[in-house]
A protein has these predicted regions:
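Shared catalytic-loop signature of beta/alpha-barrel
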Residues: 80, 86, 97-220, 224
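Metal-dependent enolase-superfamily TIM-barrel catalytic cores that perform enediolate-based chemistry
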Residues: 1-103, 108
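Extended hydrophobic packing segments that form well-structured cores
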Residues: 221-253
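Residues at secondary-structure transition points
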Residues: 34, 217, 226-228
Length: 253
């Protein structure tokens, strides 16, 4: 993505040139944490997404993540304004914990709504399915209970015609587990983490081909850790990005 239509268009062109056919972007321009953002904010967000759509056409799937950082009033406005540009799905238009509000937004649009990275085990996903609050679930295998628990979640979702798009920004081991799950369920949609190659962590890095990762064939998860390379990374300090409104108050990044 990018904070201008021009930057966003160039970014998605580069991703498509690398072979990706399903891409997720963010809202990009952070608001001020207001309950209702300005009309200008809505227009800017839509202009950026529209530029991405125009740059690659309708053959590339483009999803957009609100990160659960948008108030429901603004989320509804943004979702409606994005409809003409056919997002693949909208992720976390609001926080998933208030399932009734999420369901209200889902009912207000034809765009598929996705959620799940902050939900845990089958019990965390049950209410979302029962209330039809989302049609795409994004469990994180590292947090939601592992391969077997997430397989159960996928089975529950199948009964509600909901798809699975596992959340995975973590690393090559988590991605390997996701790939095994993806290949074993009928309602798999897309896998996050396409830019994770495992370079410097596993002996045979991932290589996507035309937007797809080949299924592992080696024993276990199908990867072998590069212990020597990993040793150089022990103690690396990574922190979440931080975002602030114009008045200096902290907002969800």
């Amino acid at each position: 993505g990018g904070n201008t239509p021009e930057a966003a268009a160039e970014s998605i062109k580069q991703a498509v040139a690398m072979g990706f056919n399903c891409i997720k972007t963010g809202v990009g321009l952070r608001g001020n944490g207001r309950v209702i953002e300005t009309a200008e904010h809505t227009e800017n967000v839509v202009a950026i997404f529209a530029a991405m759509r125009e740059a690659v056409g309708n053959s590339v799937d483009i999803a957009i993540d609100f990160h659960g950082a948008v108030a429901p009033q603004t989320a509804k406005r943004l979702v409606k304004a994005l409809e003409p540009y056919h997002p693949f799905f909208i992720e976390e238009p609001v926080q998933a914990q208030n399932v009734d509000v999420l369901a209200d937004i889902t009912r207000s649009t034809s765009i598929p709504i996705a959620t799940g990275e902050r939900l845990f085990t089958k019990w965390g996903f049950r209410e979302v399915l029962e209330k039809r609050a989302a049609s795409i679930l994004q469990p994180d295998l590292s947090h939601a209970g592992g391969i077997m628990e997430t397989r159960i979640i996928a089975g529950m979702a199948e009964a509600y015609y909901a798809a699975i798009a596992p959340h995975c920004p973590l690393g090559p081991i988590a991605l390997a587990a996701c790939i095994h799950l993806d290949a074993s369920i009928p309602n798999f949609l897309a896998q996050e983490g396409g830019r994770i190659t495992g370079e410097g962590y596993i002996k045979t890095p991932y290589k996507q081909v035309n937007g797809y990762l080949p299924l592992p064939t080696a024993p276990g998860l199908g990867i072998e850790l590069d212990d020597e390379a990993i040793a150089d990374k022990i103690g690396h300090d990574w922190q979440n990005p931080k975002a602030y409104a114009e008045d200096g108050s902290a907002i969800d990044w």
